[in-house]
């Protein structure tokens, strides 16, 4: 697996994005992702759940659905909404997770792209 090519592709994404392997290890990360979280990402060591949730276990072992596990089971892209621990406190994120295959169809890892969810006020304006 050529991480430098994957890193270049991750860098081309404007939204926070990472490339992770089936063991949850982050192997490529873009600057918007680094800017989102307080903890430093150490490629080849940091795990996605450690950075985004500050958990020692994957999401599905901590009460949330795990998009990586869902991708592994279905073999297809998936989206989930998570509450992440960001630089600015808790923030809801829409997560797109897509499997990345080699030319033989084998899964190399997973592309995760985040979109912060902005909520409108539930109260009608007065005035």
Model-predicted regions and their roles:
Residues 83-88, 101:
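PAS-family sensory domains
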Residues 100-127:
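Sensory coupling linkers of modular signal transduction proteins
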Residues 34-53:
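PAS and related sensory helical modules
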Residues 1-34:
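Sensory modules in modular signal-transduction proteins
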Residues 81, 92-95, 111:
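PAS/PAC sensory module
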Residues 51-83:
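Terminal output helix/cap of sensory domains in signal transduction proteins
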């Amino acid at each position: 697996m050529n991480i430098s090519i994957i890193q270049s592709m991750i860098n081309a994404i404007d939204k926070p994005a990472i490339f992770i392997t089936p063991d949850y290890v982050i192997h490529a990360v873009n600057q918007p992702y680094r800017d989102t979280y307080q903890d430093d990402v150490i490629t080849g060591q940091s795990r996605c759940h450690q950075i985004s949730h500050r958990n020692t276990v994957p999401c599905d072992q901590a009460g949330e659905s795990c998009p990586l596990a869902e991708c592994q089971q279905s073999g297809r892209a998936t989206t989930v909404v998570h509450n992440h621990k960001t630089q600015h406190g808790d923030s809801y994120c829409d997560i797109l997770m897509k499997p990345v295959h080699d030319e033989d169809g084998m899964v190399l890892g997973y592309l995760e792209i985040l979109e912060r969810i902005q909520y409108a006020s539930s109260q009608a304006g007065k005035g």
